[in-house]
A protein has these predicted regions:
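ATP-binding glycine-rich loop module of kinase domains
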Residues: 1, 144-163
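Surface-exposed, low-hydrophobicity interaction/linker segments
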Residues: 1-23, 27, 103-127
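Short amphipathic alpha-helices in soluble, non-transmembrane regions
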Residues: 2, 50-60
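Extended charged low-complexity segments that act as oligomerization/scaffolding linkers
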Residues: 26-31, 38
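Extracellular structured ligand-interaction cores
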Residues: 35-37, 152-153
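Helix N-cap motif at beta-to-alpha junctions
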Residues: 42-48
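Conserved short beta-strand edge segments in small beta-sheet-based binding/regulatory domains
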Residues: 60-82
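Juxta-kinase regulatory segment immediately upstream of eukaryotic protein kinase catalytic domains
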Residues: 88-146
Length: 163
């Protein structure tokens, strides 16, 4: 992966120290940053899509990875995730202490650590959203409340509605 990044002169950051990697992959790390071993910063939308496509072709889909809660997985990859947001803090975009974008129709979107994938309403995602994905949980339980969240898993309160 690093040779690809450097050969294409991409901006990136990565976790270097083994102890830091283990810490990042532990349940002690915030859900918004857990699992992010390497982060690439594309220069524009076109390079973003090219990078995703090329990495998807290079990294085996069968390789297990850590699910990144704040990002969206690319296609059926377990290792390639993306999100929308600022690369660095810019004082010109700070509102109420958070990096903020304003849409053409006055919409406001703030970039801060989140536990789920989030796009501004005026930005079209590069993939179709698949909200119909079924799971054992969704097929058998009605969730009433989230009791605890962590990068190691969540605890829910709900009722069984189908055995």
């Amino acid at each position: 992966m690093i040779p690809y990044i450097e050969n294409n002169k991409l901006s990136y950051k990565y976790i270097y120290e083994k102890d830091d990697i283990l810490q990042n992959f532990s349940i002690k790390t915030s859900m918004s940053s857990s699992g992010k071993l390497i982060t690439i910063y594309p220069k524009d939308q076109l390079s973003f899509q090219k990078i995703l496509s090329e990495l998807y072709d290079r990294i085996p889909k069968t390789t297990d990875g850590i699910y990144v809660m704040s990002d969206r997985s690319y296609r059926d990859s377990n290792n390639i995730f993306y999100r929308y947001g600022f690369f660095k803090e810019d004082i010109n975009y700070i509102k109420d202490g958070k990096l903020t974008l304003n849409g053409l129709n006055g919409e406001i979107w703030q970039d801060y650590p989140k536990n789920c994938f989030d796009l501004p309403s005026w930005i079209e995602d590069i993939q179709e959203s698949d909200l119909s994905e079924e799971s054992y949980l969704s097929e058998h339980y009605i969730i009433n409340e989230v009791l605890k969240t962590s990068s190691g898993g969540n605890v829910y309160k709900g009722i069984i509605w189908r055995l």
